[in-house]
Amino acid sequence: MNEFVIDKKAMRQAFSRAAEGYDASAVLQREVCMRMLERLEYIKLQPARLLDAGSGTGWGGRQLAEKYPAAQVISLDIAIGMLQTSKSRSSWWQKLFGGCRQLPVCADVEALPLAANSLDMVWSNLAVQWCNDLPATFVELHRVLKTEGLLMFSTLGPDTLKELRQAFKGVDERSHLNRFADMHDIGDMLVQAGFAEPVMDMEYLTLTYEDVRGVLQDLKAIGAHNTTAGRGQGLMGKAAWARLLENYEKLRRDGKLPATYEVVYGHAWKPAPRVNRDGAAIIKTSFKIK
Protein backbone atom coordinates (compact mmCIF):
# COMPACT_ATOMS: atom_id res chain seq x y z
CA MET A 1 0.00 0.00 0.00
CA ASN A 2 1.17 3.55 -0.81
CA GLU A 3 2.36 5.14 2.44
CA PHE A 4 0.54 8.36 1.55
CA VAL A 5 -2.86 6.73 1.01
CA ILE A 6 -5.26 8.08 3.62
CA ASP A 7 -6.68 5.48 5.98
CA LYS A 8 -10.37 6.42 5.82
CA LYS A 9 -11.30 4.44 8.93
CA ALA A 10 -8.63 6.21 10.97
CA MET A 11 -9.65 9.56 9.50
CA ARG A 12 -13.32 8.98 10.31
CA GLN A 13 -12.46 8.09 13.90
CA ALA A 14 -10.10 11.07 14.27
CA PHE A 15 -12.70 13.58 13.12
CA SER A 16 -15.45 12.03 15.23
CA ARG A 17 -13.24 12.21 18.33
CA ALA A 18 -12.36 15.82 17.55
CA ALA A 19 -15.94 16.95 16.88
CA GLU A 20 -16.88 18.29 20.32
CA GLY A 21 -13.88 20.62 20.63
CA TYR A 22 -13.42 21.23 16.91
CA ASP A 23 -14.78 24.77 16.65
CA ALA A 24 -12.48 26.10 19.37
CA SER A 25 -9.40 25.16 17.33
CA ALA A 26 -10.70 25.47 13.76
CA VAL A 27 -9.42 29.03 13.31
CA LEU A 28 -8.09 28.39 9.81
CA GLN A 29 -11.21 26.56 8.64
CA ARG A 30 -13.50 29.38 9.73
CA GLU A 31 -11.28 32.08 8.23
CA VAL A 32 -11.14 30.27 4.88
CA CYS A 33 -14.91 29.77 4.98
CA MET A 34 -15.42 33.51 5.43
CA ARG A 35 -13.13 34.22 2.48
CA MET A 36 -15.05 31.75 0.34
CA LEU A 37 -18.32 33.44 1.30
CA GLU A 38 -16.85 36.77 0.18
CA ARG A 39 -16.00 35.23 -3.20
CA LEU A 40 -19.54 33.91 -3.45
CA GLU A 41 -20.88 37.49 -3.35
CA TYR A 42 -19.64 37.99 -6.92
CA ILE A 43 -21.41 34.93 -8.29
CA LYS A 44 -25.03 35.19 -9.38
CA LEU A 45 -26.68 31.98 -8.29
CA GLN A 46 -29.80 31.09 -6.33
CA PRO A 47 -29.52 27.34 -5.68
CA ALA A 48 -32.59 25.37 -4.72
CA ARG A 49 -30.51 22.42 -3.52
CA LEU A 50 -26.87 22.50 -2.53
CA LEU A 51 -24.30 20.20 -0.99
CA ASP A 52 -21.86 21.14 1.77
CA ALA A 53 -19.28 18.41 1.13
CA GLY A 54 -17.20 17.81 4.24
CA SER A 55 -19.52 19.87 6.42
CA GLY A 56 -17.76 19.26 9.74
CA THR A 57 -19.65 20.76 12.68
CA GLY A 58 -21.91 22.66 10.29
CA TRP A 59 -20.70 26.23 10.77
CA GLY A 60 -20.27 26.82 7.04
CA GLY A 61 -23.55 25.11 6.23
CA ARG A 62 -25.38 27.44 8.60
CA GLN A 63 -23.86 30.44 6.80
CA LEU A 64 -25.06 29.02 3.49
CA ALA A 65 -28.54 28.41 4.90
CA GLU A 66 -28.71 32.06 5.95
CA LYS A 67 -27.51 33.23 2.53
CA TYR A 68 -29.93 30.96 0.67
CA PRO A 69 -32.94 30.61 3.02
CA ALA A 70 -35.09 28.88 0.41
CA ALA A 71 -32.46 26.26 -0.44
CA GLN A 72 -32.15 22.74 0.91
CA VAL A 73 -28.64 22.31 2.32
CA ILE A 74 -27.30 18.76 2.37
CA SER A 75 -24.62 18.56 5.08
CA LEU A 76 -22.38 15.62 4.20
CA ASP A 77 -19.48 14.40 6.31
CA ILE A 78 -17.62 11.11 6.64
CA ALA A 79 -17.59 11.37 10.46
CA ILE A 80 -20.88 10.74 12.26
CA GLY A 81 -19.53 12.61 15.29
CA MET A 82 -19.27 15.80 13.24
CA LEU A 83 -22.89 15.53 12.10
CA GLN A 84 -24.10 14.85 15.64
CA THR A 85 -22.23 17.91 16.91
CA SER A 86 -23.63 19.98 14.05
CA LYS A 87 -27.17 19.03 14.99
CA SER A 88 -26.61 19.86 18.66
CA ARG A 89 -25.33 23.34 17.76
CA SER A 90 -28.20 24.37 15.55
CA SER A 91 -30.32 27.07 17.15
CA TRP A 92 -33.75 26.16 18.50
CA TRP A 93 -35.54 28.00 15.71
CA GLN A 94 -33.45 26.21 13.07
CA LYS A 95 -34.39 22.87 14.61
CA LEU A 96 -38.05 23.87 14.77
CA PHE A 97 -38.49 25.63 11.44
CA GLY A 98 -35.41 24.86 9.36
CA GLY A 99 -35.00 21.13 9.89
CA CYS A 100 -36.68 20.21 6.63
CA ARG A 101 -34.27 22.48 4.73
CA GLN A 102 -31.08 20.93 6.14
CA LEU A 103 -30.37 17.26 5.58
CA PRO A 104 -27.44 15.51 7.33
CA VAL A 105 -25.80 12.68 5.38
CA CYS A 106 -22.92 10.53 6.66
CA ALA A 107 -20.92 9.50 3.60
CA ASP A 108 -17.61 9.79 1.77
CA VAL A 109 -17.17 12.62 -0.76
CA GLU A 110 -15.51 10.07 -3.06
CA ALA A 111 -18.74 8.02 -3.27
CA LEU A 112 -21.77 10.29 -2.97
CA PRO A 113 -25.15 8.64 -2.26
CA LEU A 114 -26.85 11.28 -4.41
CA ALA A 115 -28.58 11.12 -7.77
CA ALA A 116 -26.95 12.46 -10.91
CA ASN A 117 -27.92 15.99 -11.94
CA SER A 118 -29.57 16.65 -8.58
CA LEU A 119 -27.70 19.69 -7.20
CA ASP A 120 -27.43 23.33 -8.18
CA MET A 121 -24.26 23.89 -6.20
CA VAL A 122 -21.51 21.95 -4.43
CA TRP A 123 -19.60 23.77 -1.69
CA SER A 124 -16.57 22.24 0.00
CA ASN A 125 -14.33 24.01 2.49
CA LEU A 126 -10.97 22.35 3.23
CA ALA A 127 -12.24 18.81 2.69
CA VAL A 128 -11.16 17.41 -0.69
CA GLN A 129 -7.53 17.16 0.47
CA TRP A 130 -8.73 14.09 2.41
CA CYS A 131 -9.67 12.28 -0.81
CA ASN A 132 -7.36 9.54 -2.07
CA ASP A 133 -8.37 9.94 -5.72
CA LEU A 134 -8.89 13.64 -6.36
CA PRO A 135 -9.49 13.37 -10.15
CA ALA A 136 -12.21 10.75 -9.53
CA THR A 137 -13.67 12.92 -6.77
CA PHE A 138 -14.13 15.81 -9.21
CA VAL A 139 -15.81 13.42 -11.66
CA GLU A 140 -18.18 12.42 -8.85
CA LEU A 141 -18.95 16.04 -7.97
CA HIS A 142 -19.55 16.75 -11.67
CA ARG A 143 -21.98 13.80 -11.80
CA VAL A 144 -24.27 15.12 -9.05
CA LEU A 145 -24.38 18.70 -10.35
CA LYS A 146 -27.05 19.89 -12.73
CA THR A 147 -26.09 21.58 -15.98
CA GLU A 148 -24.87 25.11 -15.18
CA GLY A 149 -24.35 24.03 -11.57
CA LEU A 150 -21.48 25.51 -9.57
CA LEU A 151 -18.62 23.79 -7.77
CA MET A 152 -16.89 26.03 -5.23
CA PHE A 153 -14.17 24.67 -2.98
CA SER A 154 -11.00 25.27 -1.02
CA THR A 155 -8.21 22.84 -0.29
CA LEU A 156 -4.58 22.76 0.80
CA GLY A 157 -1.52 23.06 -1.43
CA PRO A 158 1.91 21.37 -1.16
CA ASP A 159 3.52 24.14 0.93
CA THR A 160 1.07 23.50 3.77
CA LEU A 161 2.87 23.01 7.12
CA LYS A 162 6.20 23.43 5.36
CA GLU A 163 7.88 24.32 8.67
CA LEU A 164 6.69 21.15 10.36
CA ARG A 165 7.61 19.12 7.30
CA GLN A 166 11.12 20.61 7.39
CA ALA A 167 11.44 19.97 11.12
CA PHE A 168 10.58 16.29 10.64
CA LYS A 169 13.38 15.81 8.10
CA GLY A 170 16.12 13.70 9.61
CA VAL A 171 13.99 12.70 12.61
CA ASP A 172 12.96 9.28 11.24
CA GLU A 173 11.73 7.59 8.07
CA ARG A 174 8.03 7.65 8.93
CA SER A 175 5.31 9.44 6.97
CA HIS A 176 4.33 12.31 9.28
CA LEU A 177 2.26 14.57 7.03
CA ASN A 178 -0.24 14.19 4.22
CA ARG A 179 0.69 15.22 0.69
CA PHE A 180 -1.32 17.90 -1.12
CA ALA A 181 -1.92 18.56 -4.83
CA ASP A 182 -0.58 21.59 -6.69
CA MET A 183 -3.06 24.30 -7.71
CA HIS A 184 -2.27 23.97 -11.42
CA ASP A 185 -2.73 20.20 -11.32
CA ILE A 186 -6.11 20.69 -9.63
CA GLY A 187 -7.18 23.03 -12.43
CA ASP A 188 -6.25 20.36 -14.98
CA MET A 189 -8.23 17.77 -13.00
CA LEU A 190 -11.34 19.98 -13.15
CA VAL A 191 -11.11 20.26 -16.93
CA GLN A 192 -10.56 16.50 -17.29
CA ALA A 193 -13.62 15.90 -15.09
CA GLY A 194 -15.77 17.92 -17.50
CA PHE A 195 -15.94 21.27 -15.73
CA ALA A 196 -15.77 24.54 -17.65
CA GLU A 197 -14.16 27.88 -16.88
CA PRO A 198 -12.20 26.79 -13.80
CA VAL A 199 -10.84 29.68 -11.76
CA MET A 200 -7.98 28.90 -9.38
CA ASP A 201 -6.02 31.05 -6.96
CA MET A 202 -4.10 30.61 -3.74
CA GLU A 203 -2.74 32.46 -0.74
CA TYR A 204 -0.56 31.72 2.26
CA LEU A 205 -2.05 31.98 5.74
CA THR A 206 0.26 31.64 8.73
CA LEU A 207 -0.73 30.78 12.29
CA THR A 208 1.77 31.32 15.10
CA TYR A 209 2.41 29.28 18.24
CA GLU A 210 4.41 29.43 21.42
CA ASP A 211 5.80 25.91 20.97
CA VAL A 212 5.67 22.78 18.82
CA ARG A 213 3.18 21.12 21.15
CA GLY A 214 0.72 23.88 20.31
CA VAL A 215 1.02 23.14 16.59
CA LEU A 216 0.51 19.41 17.05
CA GLN A 217 -2.29 19.85 19.59
CA ASP A 218 -4.21 22.09 17.20
CA LEU A 219 -3.86 19.53 14.42
CA LYS A 220 -5.13 16.81 16.72
CA ALA A 221 -7.94 19.00 18.05
CA ILE A 222 -9.40 19.40 14.57
CA GLY A 223 -8.76 15.78 13.58
CA ALA A 224 -6.19 16.83 10.98
CA HIS A 225 -3.20 14.91 12.26
CA ASN A 226 -1.57 12.28 10.08
CA THR A 227 -3.89 9.44 8.98
CA THR A 228 -1.83 8.08 6.08
CA ALA A 229 -1.08 4.38 5.80
CA GLY A 230 2.63 5.05 6.38
CA ARG A 231 2.17 6.87 9.67
CA GLY A 232 3.90 5.63 12.78
CA GLN A 233 1.73 3.48 15.02
CA GLY A 234 3.44 4.28 18.31
CA LEU A 235 4.60 7.30 20.26
CA MET A 236 7.64 9.21 19.09
CA GLY A 237 10.77 8.37 21.07
CA LYS A 238 12.47 10.93 23.30
CA ALA A 239 15.45 11.32 20.97
CA ALA A 240 13.25 11.84 17.91
CA TRP A 241 11.06 14.32 19.81
CA ALA A 242 14.15 16.27 20.89
CA ARG A 243 15.36 16.47 17.27
CA LEU A 244 11.96 17.67 16.14
CA LEU A 245 11.95 20.43 18.76
CA GLU A 246 15.49 21.46 17.88
CA ASN A 247 14.72 21.61 14.15
CA TYR A 248 11.51 23.60 14.58
CA GLU A 249 13.11 26.05 17.03
CA LYS A 250 15.48 27.13 14.26
CA LEU A 251 12.42 28.51 12.45
CA ARG A 252 11.22 30.71 15.31
CA ARG A 253 10.55 34.30 14.22
CA ASP A 254 9.72 37.24 16.49
CA GLY A 255 9.37 34.85 19.40
CA LYS A 256 6.76 32.65 17.68
CA LEU A 257 6.79 29.39 15.75
CA PRO A 258 5.05 29.71 12.35
CA ALA A 259 2.71 27.16 10.78
CA THR A 260 2.06 28.08 7.16
CA TYR A 261 -0.93 26.89 5.16
CA GLU A 262 -1.10 27.14 1.38
CA VAL A 263 -4.81 27.64 0.81
CA VAL A 264 -6.07 26.90 -2.70
CA TYR A 265 -9.44 28.24 -3.89
CA GLY A 266 -11.31 27.05 -6.94
CA HIS A 267 -14.65 27.27 -8.66
CA ALA A 268 -15.97 25.92 -11.94
CA TRP A 269 -19.24 25.28 -13.75
CA LYS A 270 -20.84 22.18 -15.21
CA PRO A 271 -21.50 23.03 -18.87
CA ALA A 272 -24.25 21.69 -21.09
CA PRO A 273 -23.30 18.31 -22.62
CA ARG A 274 -21.77 18.36 -26.11
CA VAL A 275 -23.09 14.93 -27.05
CA ASN A 276 -26.25 13.00 -26.17
CA ARG A 277 -26.42 9.53 -24.63
CA ASP A 278 -26.00 7.95 -28.07
CA GLY A 279 -22.82 9.92 -28.71
CA ALA A 280 -24.34 12.27 -31.27
CA ALA A 281 -23.18 15.88 -31.15
CA ILE A 282 -25.62 18.43 -29.71
CA ILE A 283 -25.70 21.57 -31.83
CA LYS A 284 -27.68 24.52 -30.52
CA THR A 285 -29.13 26.95 -33.02
CA SER A 286 -30.87 30.26 -32.63
CA PHE A 287 -32.92 31.52 -35.59
CA LYS A 288 -36.39 32.82 -36.38
CA ILE A 289 -38.67 31.81 -39.24
CA LYS A 290 -40.23 34.87 -40.85
Curated annotation (Swiss-Prot):
InterPro entries registered for this protein in UniProt: BioC, Malonyl-ACP_OMT, Methyltransf_11, SAM-dependent_MTases_sf
Transferase among keywords: yes
Keyword Nucleus: no
EC number: 2.1.1.197
Superkingdom, taxonomy of origin: Bacteria
Enzyme kind, highest EC tier: transferase
Reaction it catalyzes: malonyl-[ACP] + S-adenosyl-L-methionine = malonyl-[ACP] methyl ester + S-adenosyl-L-homocysteine
GO molecular function: carboxyl-O-methyltransferase activity; malonyl-CoA methyltransferase activity; S-adenosylmethionine-dependent methyltransferase activity
Keywords carried by this UniProt record: Biotin biosynthesis, Methyltransferase, S-adenosyl-L-methionine, Transferase
Pfam families: Methyltransf_11 (PF08241)
Pathway(s): Cofactor biosynthesis; biotin biosynthesis
Family statement drawn from the similarity comment of this UniProt entry: Belongs to the methyltransferase superfamily.
Record function comment: Converts the free carboxyl group of a malonyl-thioester to its methyl ester by transfer of a methyl group from S-adenosyl-L-methionine (SAM). It allows to synthesize pimeloyl-ACP via the fatty acid synthetic pathway.
Descriptive protein name: Malonyl-[acyl-carrier protein] O-methyltransferase
Provenance organism: Gallionella capsiferriformans (strain ES-2) (Gallionella ferruginea capsiferriformans (strain ES-2))
